[in-house]
UniProtKB/Swiss-Prot annotation:
Enzyme class of the recorded protein, top EC level: hydrolase
Parts of the chain that traverse the membrane: 14-34, 40-60, 79-99, 112-132, 141-161, 182-202, 217-237, 242-262
Record's protein name: Undecaprenyl-diphosphatase
Family: Belongs to the UppP family.
Entry GO CC: plasma membrane
One GO process term, biological-process aspect: regulation of cell shape
Enzyme Commission number(s): 3.6.1.27
Gene: uppP
Miscellaneous: Bacitracin is thought to be involved in the inhibition of peptidoglycan synthesis by sequestering undecaprenyl diphosphate, thereby reducing the pool of lipid carrier available.
Membrane-topology annotation of the record: Multi-pass membrane protein
Job description of the protein: Catalyzes the dephosphorylation of undecaprenyl diphosphate (UPP). Confers resistance to bacitracin.
């Protein structure tokens, strides 16, 4: 892997982890489009740990308040949010533990299938953004809503769905304001990224030193770009909603289809 490839993939991860466009789909599709070799599991760990750092740094004050209040005052506004995040994390973590390897094997080189998923979820995102009645603030959400958002996160294993996309969309369907749906999606991302990243890192810890340069580049790039992506999305949803990301999904699906057909000839 070249330095340029490490930076480019770090940018894709930083954007795709927090924007509703699917980081996993981008990390599969773009190396295929450019004819690059598959990146290693160690590098994949670096990318995810980078985005973990991004969300922890961006929301560090929120996380500090949430953890302290969750332990000291569990019935307070921030205290409830602590337990809501835990409730929302369990379904995705369980589903990932049981089925992640199976899903990865099925979707590994199914580029046309990924294009279809990107487009279909693009339509869903567009439709929900158009019809959802967004009135509920983050402080007014309940444990039932948190649980449903957590269950929806399980579907993010499928490349093209997007963890942030499916959780934000579910939040919108449940009546959360767009900013609230986005913020809860970001806040609940840390435990799932931390868990998955820690497990993968422990499995591949012996290979880190051999790939340290690319590991560091991918980590740093995804962290910086991820931080900027969070800021960008929180700003744009207030003005334009999520439709712009649906349009991008349609465009990328069309590009994948075109390349797939050209290479099949």
């Amino acid at each position: 892997m070249t330095t340029f490839q490490a930076i480019f993939l770090g940018i894709l991860q930083g954007l795709g982890e927090f924007l509703p466009i699917s980081s996993s789909a981008h990390l599969i599709i773009f190396p295929w489009l450019f004819g690059w070799k598959e990146h290693s599991l160690v590098f994949d760990v670096a990318l995810h740990l980078g985005t973990l750092l991004a969300v922890l740094v961006y929301f560090w004050k929120d996380y500090l308040d949430i953890v302290v209040q969750g332990i000291a005052k569990p019935k307070s506004e921030k205290g409830k949010l602590f337990w809501f995040i835990i409730v929302a994390t369990i379904p995705g973590a369980l589903f990932g533990y049981l089925f992640e390897n199976i899903v990865e094997e099925v979707f590994r080189k199914q580029y046309l299938l990924i294009a279809i998923v990107l487009a279909v979820f693009g339509f869903i995102l567009y439709y929900v953004d158009s019809i959802a009645k967004n009135k509920i603030e983050l402080s007014k959400m309940n444990v039932f809503q948190a649980a449903l958002i957590g269950v929806s996160q399980a579907f993010a294993l499928f490349p093209g769905i997007s963890r942030s996309g499916i959780t934000m969309t579910t939040g919108l369907l449940l009546g959360l304001k767009k900013e609230a749906a986005a913020k809860f999606s970001f806040l609940m991302s840390a435990p799932i990224i931390l868990g998955a990243g820690a497990v993968s890192l422990l499995k591949n810890i012996n290979h880190v030193s051999a790939e340290f340069s690319n590991f560091a580049i991918g980590f740093f790039t995804s962290a910086v770009v991820g931080f900027l992506a969070i800021h960008f999305l929180l700003g744009i949803v207030k003005k334009s909603g999520f439709k712009i990301f649906a349009y991008y999904r349609f465009f990328l699906a069309a590009v994948i289809l075109a390349f797939y057909l050209l290479r099949a000839v």
